[in-house]
């Protein structure tokens, strides 16, 4: 598995600025249909072409982050994480007008830097059928799920935000904002 791919170009005139999200929204999006590509190409979901049921049979079960604003979970690079389930989408908004004006002849590019983990629902992944145990900074990635998770200050955030149950073969969901029941059938 790849941990990181990076390509850097040395450009001494480039200035790097940092923006924090001004708002967050975790919500249901659906499952992107896969693009028609060659058999040796990776599966590439299309964000615009959405279906309500997943193309796979098993979803890791456990407590996922509830829908709505999740600002406290991404406010710091700590052990507080947004637990995004399959079909979910996290929208981040930024105030780009807070950056300095672009000098003439220059252009601005944005790069989203994230810190997180991805867990596959794979029989070859330890505890691949469950959301928990949650990962943490400094864990032994090769032993994840075998060593106990230490207590962290961010555990209170998980108690507050991870209140949405997702499970295997779970095609029903609850619309958090309206409280009305929706089904993917």
Regions found by a protein language model. Name each.
Residues 2-185:
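Activation corresponds to long, low-complexity, non-globular regions
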């Amino acid at each position: 598995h790849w941990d990181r791919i990076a390509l850097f170009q040395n450009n001494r005139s480039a200035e790097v600025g940092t923006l924090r999200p001004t708002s967050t929204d975790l919500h249901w999006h659906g499952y992107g249909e896969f693009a028609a590509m060659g058999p040796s190409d990776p599966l590439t979901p299309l964000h615009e072409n959405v279906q309500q049921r997943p193309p796979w049979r098993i979803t890791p079960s456990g407590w996922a982050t509830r829908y709505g604003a999740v600002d406290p979970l991404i406010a710091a690079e700590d052990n507080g994480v947004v637990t995004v389930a399959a079909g979910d989408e996290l929208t981040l908004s930024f105030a780009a007008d807070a950056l300095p004006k672009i000098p003439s002849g220059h252009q601005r590019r944005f790069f989203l830097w994230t810190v997180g983990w991805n867990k596959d629902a794979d029989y070859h992944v330890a505890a691949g059928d469950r959301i928990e145990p949650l990962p943490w900074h400094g864990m032994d990635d090769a032993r994840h799920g075998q060593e106990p998770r230490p207590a962290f200050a961010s555990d209170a955030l998980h108690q507050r935000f991870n209140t949405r149950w997702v499970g295997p073969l779970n095609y029903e969901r609850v619309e958090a904002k309206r409280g009305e029941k929706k089904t993917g059938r």
